[in-house]
């Protein structure tokens, strides 16, 4: 990243330059989408101990390529970068077998009115996370982006670089597999 912006650091771009405008445009998306990228990476299996670093790397890689990203494609580019980065982190985690305790960002942000409600919500989240972990990555990515992050089929197709019809079929398969997985887990099976 330092090489890409070395000239820009020596000679700051004028506020009207294409680089400055692209950097500002991408910077707004990066700021707005931080939590989305964090959750996406976590749900794609990036270990909890690495998810903050992976999020920052995805954001930095996107900013470093700001000149190459077309307007209105910033979010898709950022999510695609995060998607590809998740493979790197999962590969590294498999090699090191470092499995830390799961920390759910939503749990840190909410307070339940009763201990029973909080416990049930935590159990539901753990069940969902375990069921999601059983899905193949390509199904988990589509389901997470659509159901949990609210992206459209077109946006998902762009992020994952697959046809829109493939998004629909993977979503249908993912929902079916998730339903079966949740049912098995509730019955106490594997």
Residue spans for each PLM region:
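Structural recognition of an alpha-helix C-terminal capping motif at a helix-to-coil junction
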Residues: 50-60, 64, 72-84
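Helix-turn-helix DNA-binding module
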Residues: 133, 137, 141, 149-166, ...
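Arg/Lys-rich amphipathic alpha helix in sigma70-family domain 2
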Residues: 81-101, 113, 121, 184
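Amphipathic, Lys/Arg- and hydrophobic-enriched alpha-helical face
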Residues: 28-48, 64-65, 132, 184
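Short helix-capping/turn signature of helix-turn-helix
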Residues: 32-34, 43-44, 144-151, 161
């Amino acid at each position: 990243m330092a090489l890409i912006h070395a000239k820009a650091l020596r000679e700051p771009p004028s506020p009207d330059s294409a680089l400055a405008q692209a950097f500002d445009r991408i910077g707004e998306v990066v700021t707005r989408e931080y939590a989305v990228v964090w959750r996406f990476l976590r749900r794609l299996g990036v270990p909890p101990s690495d998810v903050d670093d992976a999020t920052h790397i995805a954001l930095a890689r996107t900013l470093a390529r700001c000149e190459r990203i077309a307007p209105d494609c910033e979010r898709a580019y950022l999510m695609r970068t995060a998607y590809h980065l998740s493979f790197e982190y999962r590969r590294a985690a498999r090699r090191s077998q470092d499995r830390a305790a799961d920390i759910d960002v939503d749990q840190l942000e909410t307070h339940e009115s009763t201990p029973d409600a909080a416990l049930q919500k935590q159990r539901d989240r753990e069940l969902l996370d375990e069921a999601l972990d059983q899905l193949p990555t390509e199904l988990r990515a589509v389901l997470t982006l659509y159901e949990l992050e609210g992206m459209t089929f077109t946006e998902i197709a762009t992020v994952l670089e697959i046809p829109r019809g493939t998004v629909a079929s993977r979503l249908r398969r993912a929902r079916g597999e998730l339903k079966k997985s949740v049912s098995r887990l509730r019955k106490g099976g594997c």
